[in-house]
């Protein structure tokens, strides 16, 4: 695919990630940190996020299934997940973590379960969308290491 078409596709894809609420300004800030000396910085940070957040989601699921539920532990785990999501600009993940925390504070186990399922879906969707985005970035190569198109 021609370079300019790829670039347009990347800009369009990124704009959609923002318009659909998957990402927030923190993602742009991460991209601004990326430079020629670390052309895959954002992709590497995202990979670390997905590894860590997968572990946290598993831990949350195990804590929900453990009886009696330890809502303080659940709150702590979700706070970690929310912080991780915030660090890469995962807006929908961060927002669903906030909903989970409200359910947790209310001791609403069923609400926590629903929020967990939504967090898992948002996590999987964001991972798929960012993998596609990074794949396009790899196709244009290091000459365009930061596509800093504002949304």
From Swiss-Prot:
Gene3D superfamilies the UniProt entry points to: HPT domain
GO CC, alphabetical: cytoplasm; nucleus
GO biological processes: cytokinin-activated signaling pathway; phosphorelay signal transduction system
Entry keyword annotation includes Signal: no
Classification via InterPro entries: AHP1-5/YPD1 (IPR045871), HPT_dom_sf (IPR036641), Sig_transdc_His_kin_Hpt_dom (IPR008207)
Phenotype reported upon loss of the gene: Dwarf, narrow leaf, low fertility and small grain phenotypes.
Identification of the protein by name: Pseudo histidine-containing phosphotransfer protein 2
Species: Oryza sativa subsp. japonica (Rice)
Taxonomic lineage from the root: Eukaryota, Viridiplantae, Streptophyta, Embryophyta, Tracheophyta
